[in-house]
């Protein structure tokens, strides 16, 4: 897992900062009808930040269910296997967007 690209946009009126970029995840195998959270380092994220992710593609049966800040500089992406068999997902590039408000902006 690695951050490939990173950019920042500032909103001086509302005091928000938006960071964006890409990262890759090579998820562990998921059993049928289960979900798991993959974590990765994303420098600068903090508790209270909003995280949005969008995979550029996914292995059939996998669903990117959501993302969150799990700790300082760390995000978690929850993947769900919707199939009745296990799935070993391929490495996938994700686009991300982090919104920071107030003092962190």
Locate each region found by the language model.
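Short acidic, gly/pro-rich beta-turn/loop elements at beta-sheet edges
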Residues: 50, 63, 87
């Amino acid at each position: 897992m690695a951050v490939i690209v990173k950019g920042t946009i500032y909103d001086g009126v509302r005091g928000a900062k938006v960071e964006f970029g890409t990262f890759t995840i090579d998820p562990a195998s998921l059993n049928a009808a289960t979900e798991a959270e993959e974590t990765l380092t994303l420098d600068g994220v903090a508790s209270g930040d909003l995280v949005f992710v969008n995979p550029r593609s996914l292995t059939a049966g996998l669903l990117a269910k959501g993302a969150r800040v799990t700790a300082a500089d760390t995000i978690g992406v929850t993947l769900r296997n919707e199939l009745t068999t296990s799935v070993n997902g391929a490495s996938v590039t994700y686009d991300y967007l982090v919104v920071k408000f107030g003092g962190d902006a």
